[in-house]
Regions:
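Class I S-adenosyl-L-methionine
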Residues: 6-135, 143, 153-158
Length: 158
């Protein structure tokens, strides 16, 4: 719903300004908190999980029940803590990383070979391309992007 979209926008702003934001403690809809801390392979793992986990260590602190609010909302809340990790450089162009992750998850039922076809250079191959986006961890996405970038650069010099 609207709450999910609003909190997503806030988190994207935090990522953009991560050099200024060392730590965040916030209360959000439980569903969003679960999405943020999700691991590869889970149904809730997605764009927000990958982007935030690339730069922040996520801790799910506790659940807040509906009854503590007046009037009570229809959803549970959760308090989470984001602490910026030591990853300063992605090892690849940030724009490429965001593009690969977004494009991949926008067609999450397809393998990356099919979903990111427009991003990968001609003739490029990688074992990651045979997987669906939810099967890749943060380091896998970074490695894929570094490989794409290296391959693009080889093509540029020809």
């Amino acid at each position: 719903g609207k709450e999910v979209e609003l909190s997503s926008q806030i988190f994207f702003r935090i990522i953009e300004n991560r050099h200024l934001v060392r730590q965040v403690v916030c209360m959000i809809q439980k569903e969003v908190a679960e999405r943020i801390e999700a691991s590869p392979g889970s149904k809730t793992y997605g764009i927000l999980s990958v982007f935030l986990q690339a730069f922040y260590h996520i801790e799910y602190l506790f659940t807040v029940g509906e009854k503590v609010f007046d009037p009570p909302p229809k959803v549970k809340s959760a308090v989470i803590r984001l602490t910026r990790n030591e990853r300063v450089e992605l090892g690849c162009e940030e724009k490429l990383f965001f593009n690969v992750v977004k494009t991949g998850f926008n067609q999450r039922r397809k393998t990356l070979r099919n979903s990111i076809r427009g991003i990968i250079p001609p003739g490029f191959d990688s074992p990651y391309l045979n997987l669906r986006p939810e099967q890749l961890g943060i380091t896998d996405f970074l490695q894929l992007c570094q490989d794409i970038e290296k391959n693009r650069n080889i093509g540029d010099k020809a």
